[in-house]
């Protein structure tokens, strides 16, 4: 699935926000300090999340990234592989972000086939949620800009 939206912040600001929240997630998940350079070069970590009264291990990979242009994240669980990226561009004085994601199940089960079918039916609602998330992110960025 791919969605392109106009954003009213600079691509550099949106990219920095994505890196900041990723760095915070790495710190929370691993208690390790990482830098933007670590993300640009590519970084891998594991996080543990609650899942159905148990814990699930998610293998996360970010990057390599192209600063202010391209942000990519992959994650993998025992059942699923997911890839998503943000591609930033400017045209005619306007800024755009293209968000794309791919989800793949590792096993070909009836439940996974039904999940894929359901996702196709829900695609319109999912695109709407993605647009809303992009809008909320730009609002957050504008409201938290550093005073210059």
Residue ranges and their predicted role:
Residues 1-6, 57, 70, 83, ...:
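Intrinsic-disorder/low-complexity, polar/charged segments enriched in Ser/Thr/Lys/Arg/Asp/Glu/Gln
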Residues 1-41:
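Hydrophobic ligand-binding cavity/cleft-lining segments
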């Amino acid at each position: 699935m791919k969605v392109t939206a106009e954003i009213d912040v600079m691509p550099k600001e949106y990219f920095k926000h994505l890196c900041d929240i990723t760095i915070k997630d790495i710190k929370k998940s691993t208690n390790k300090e990482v830098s933007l350079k670590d993300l640009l070069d590519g970084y891998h970590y594991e996080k543990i999340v609650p899942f159905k009264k148990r814990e699930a291990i998610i293998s996360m990979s970010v990057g390599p990234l192209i600063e202010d242009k391209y942000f990519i994240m992959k994650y993998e669980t025992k059942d699923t592989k997911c890839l998503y990226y943000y591609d930033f561009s400017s045209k005619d004085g306007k800024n755009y972000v293209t968000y794309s994601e791919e989800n793949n199940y590792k096993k070909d089960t009836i439940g996974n086939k039904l999940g894929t079918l359901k996702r196709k039916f829900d695609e319109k609602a999912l695109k709407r949620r993605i647009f809303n998330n992009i809008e909320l992110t730009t609002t957050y960025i504008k409201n938290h800009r550093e005073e210059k």
